[in-house]
């Protein structure tokens, strides 16, 4: 029925609470976390907080990598059977579906279909790295919509190489794990030919991956989905694509 019924929300909340209590008593479900590696980038970690920066998870974030802990759920870095965050999943059937989404998002430059886009509204929903909304950050000058980055791409600067709009600076880890924007780098590490690796992609009109004439094989919003992309993924000759797990229900969605 399409009739609004608040009791449905109550039932959903009660069911979610049951799962949370089950997780607490059985240890069956928990958020998937990864310890920070040596040299973990400060750029996508939350700013220093006097109470939480030095405490381990779940009381703080000192012992986790916030970006990889989230990204690994989607990009195939961890097998579904070994991920305590997953409640209901599909692997064999789901992998093909997810990798097809990824193919639709991959830039034409690296042999993708280059057709998937995300909306500005969705991008604006991602917070800053300190948890504030972009509107709140704009009031203090920490979120701007003019200007571009100037530092070259490197292992220490993977998300904001030169010529990227400053509106994408200091965003939360989930943003960098999920969204590709003008100037994002696609690693394609498994590509056999170096020319396909670490490609900085732009979607401006007239560029290889932008709109060309009447052709619309491009992200019309100038942004696409990178959520299910693994840095090793490449559909070029000699490359391979990591298998992913389709997660229908995650514990994070219950909390």
Question: Predicted segments — roles?
Answer:
Residues 1, 243-255:
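Extended amphipathic alpha-helical segments enriched in small hydrophobics
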Residues 2-206:
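An aromatic- and glycine-enriched ligand-binding surface/loop that stacks and positions planar moieties
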Residues 50-53, 222, 252:
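A generic alpha-helix propensity feature with a strong bias for hydrophobic helices
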Residues 85-86, 173, 177, 223-227, ...:
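Flexible, active-site-adjacent loop/turn segments at secondary-structure boundaries
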Residues 161-162, 230, 247:
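Short secondary-structure boundary micro-motifs
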Residues 193-241:
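Extended glycan-interaction surfaces of carbohydrate-active proteins
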């Amino acid at each position: 029925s399409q009739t609004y019924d608040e009791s449905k929300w109550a039932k959903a909340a009660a069911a979610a609470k049951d799962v949370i209590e089950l997780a607490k008593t059985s240890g069956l479900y928990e958020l998937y976390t990864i310890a920070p590696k040596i040299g973990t980038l400060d750029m996508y970690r939350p700013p220093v907080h006097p109470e939480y920066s030095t405490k381990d998870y779940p009381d703080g974030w000192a012992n986790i990598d916030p970006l990889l802990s989230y990204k690994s759920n989607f990009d195939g870095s961890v097998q579904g059977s070994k991920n305590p965050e997953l409640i209901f999943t599909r692997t064999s059937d789901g992998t093909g579906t997810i990798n097809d989404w990824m193919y639709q998002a991959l830039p034409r430059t690296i042999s993708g279909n280059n057709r998937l886009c995300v909306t500005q509204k969705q991008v604006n929903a991602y917070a800053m790295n300190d948890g504030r909304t972009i509107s709140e950050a704009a009031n203090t000058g920490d979120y701007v919509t003019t200007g571009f980055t100037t530092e070259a791409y490197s292992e220490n600067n993977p998300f904001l190489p030169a010529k990227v709009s400053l509106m994408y600076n200091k965003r939360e880890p989930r943003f960098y794990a999920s969204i590709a924007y003008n100037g994002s780098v696609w690693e394609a590490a498994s590509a056999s030919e170096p020319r396909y690796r670490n490609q900085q992609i732009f979607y401006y009109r007239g560029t290889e991956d932008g709109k060309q004439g009447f052709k619309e094989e491009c992200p019309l919003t100038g942004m696409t989905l990178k959520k299910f992309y693994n840095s090793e993924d490449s559909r070029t000759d000699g490359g391979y694509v990591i298998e992913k797990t389709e997660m229908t229900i995650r514990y994070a969605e219950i909390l």
